[in-house]
């Protein structure tokens, strides 16, 4: 199945000249969604991750099923108001976010961690997750994305980490 055909492109959104990649059409097709997640899991299985870290909302649609299939734990980067207890924060997020927070209990020293998200563009979100994981003593064993917008520098920003993406768009 050509997964790219299952992703709707919305022209001139959020602004003129941008073609938004809408994964909701892929998510609505159960077989396409299952195939995408199973293929990502197949490519990630050898990494022997203990934990998947993903950003809240869109990252969860990839991170949660991957965690289930791979039998790992799941930790979610989120806003502080939603996270009780001691949390690590990181400033300077991409996409206009001021910061993300990760529970300090989520990542243990030497834990093998896979970062998952639905989209790789500039790499800012994934890079932030990586820095937080490493500060907590975890070992990032790779990054995984459903979609990659090539040409925005995301893969280069993550050059020190094995990066997997299923669908690529020239951007």
UniProtKB/Swiss-Prot annotation:
Location(s), subcellular: Cytoplasm
Superkingdom field: Bacteria
Record Gene3D superfamilies: 3.40.50.2020
EC identifiers of the protein: 2.4.2.7
Keywords noted in UniProt: Cytoplasm, Glycosyltransferase, Purine salvage, Transferase
CDD domains tied to this protein: PRTases_typeI
A molecular-function term among this protein's GO annotations: adenine binding
Subcellular location, principal: cytoplasm
GO cellular component terms attached to this protein's record: cytoplasm
A biological-process GO annotation: AMP salvage
UniProt keyword Signal, yes or no: no
NCBIfam families xref list: PRK02304.1-5
Family the entry assigns: Belongs to the purine/pyrimidine phosphoribosyltransferase family.
The protein's name in its UniProt record: Adenine phosphoribosyltransferase
Organism field: Pelotomaculum thermopropionicum (strain DSM 13744 / JCM 10971 / SI)
Lineage, highest ranks first: Bacteria, Bacillati, Bacillota, Clostridia, Eubacteriales
Gene it is expressed from: apt
